[in-house]
């Protein structure tokens, strides 16, 4: 994934130099906001490096806001992202459900998230982009069900790091894939120690990667994986890439 604080074109080169097959392009401030990037130059840069692209949006867009104007602003910003992603060649774009709306219960928040996605679907369909919901910390199949069950055309974006956070909790990967494995569209990979979203190199935390990757492979999935390791030098990134590829190839 590109670092949104850095120039996108330089991040394309960096992704190619590491040997990635595609760029998980996040459109968010400070340097990669949708209305501030040059989509044509990004597409040219991706094509020059023979990289595919997957669309990613900011995790803090307030789709569940109790203020109509703020919810609408979040939708408008995401529609802007959709337009950019279509121009650069993406066919997938993720969303994070809003889960922090003070003074309102989960049913209200779920309803607002659902409304937001329903308003985004016509633009996504027009542009040929499939929307997918990424699980955040604490999400399991039950917590995502009010939205995903109501929107069968929306895919699952599995974040294995997020699925392994929570004191006293087991991994939520199994429950998510048991219910939505046939809708899996994209996977994020990063390690942690079970307490916070550390974005560590693969093997630096406590996640059982053989168990997690076996669960993914059992669904028949053979799509894209993003190594979402934000900390450490290039050696750790290269190690993580090789570890994931070797582990995936070893599973039957």
Language-model features: locations:
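Hydrophobic faces of well-ordered beta-strands that scaffold small-molecule active sites
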Residues: 1, 23-25, 53-57, 93-95, ...
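Short, well-ordered coil/turn segments that N-cap beta-strands
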Residues: 19-21, 47-53, 88-91, 125-130, ...
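Histidine-acidic metal/acid-base catalytic patches
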Residues: 5-16, 141-160, 164-252
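Active-site groove signature of glycoside hydrolases
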Residues: 85-105
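N-terminal pre-domain/capping segments
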Residues: 1-82, 86, 142, 155, ...
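Alpha-helix-loop-beta-strand connector modules within alpha/beta enzyme cores
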Residues: 39-60, 114-124, 151, 209-212, ...
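Charged helix-capping and loop-helix junction motifs
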Residues: 35-41, 70-79, 107-117, 168-177, ...
């Amino acid at each position: 994934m590109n670092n949104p604080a850095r120039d996108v074109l330089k991040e394309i080169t960096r992704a190619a130099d590491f040997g990635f097959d595609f760029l998980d392009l996040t459109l968010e401030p400070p340097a990669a906001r949708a209305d501030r990037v040059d989509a044509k130059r990004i597409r040219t840069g991706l094509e020059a490096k023979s990289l595919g692209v997957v669309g990613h949006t900011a995790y803090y867009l307030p789709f569940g806001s109790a203020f109509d104007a703020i919810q609408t602003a979040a939708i408008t910003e995401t529609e802007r992202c959709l337009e950019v992603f279509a121009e650069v060649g993406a066919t997938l774009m993720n969303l994070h459900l809003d889960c922090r709306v003070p003074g309102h219960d989960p049913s209200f928040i779920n309803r607002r998230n659902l409304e937001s996605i329903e308003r985004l679907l016509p633009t996504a369909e027009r542009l040929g982009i499939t929307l997918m919901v990424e699980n955040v910390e604490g999400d399991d199949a039950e917590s995502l069900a009010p939205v995903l069950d109501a929107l069968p055309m929306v895919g699952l974006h599995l974040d294995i790091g997020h699925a392994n956070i929570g004191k006293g909790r087991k991994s939520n990967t199994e429950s998510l894939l048991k219910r939505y494995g046939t809708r899996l569209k994209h996977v994020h990979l990063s390690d942690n120690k079970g307490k916070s979203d550390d974005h560590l190199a693969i093997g630096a935390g406590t996640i059982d990667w053989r168990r997690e990757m076996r669960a993914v492979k059992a669904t028949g999935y053979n799509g894209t994986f993003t190594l979402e390791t934000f900390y450490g030098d290039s050696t750790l990134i290269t190690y993580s890439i090789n570890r994931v590829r070797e582990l995936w190839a070893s599973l039957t």
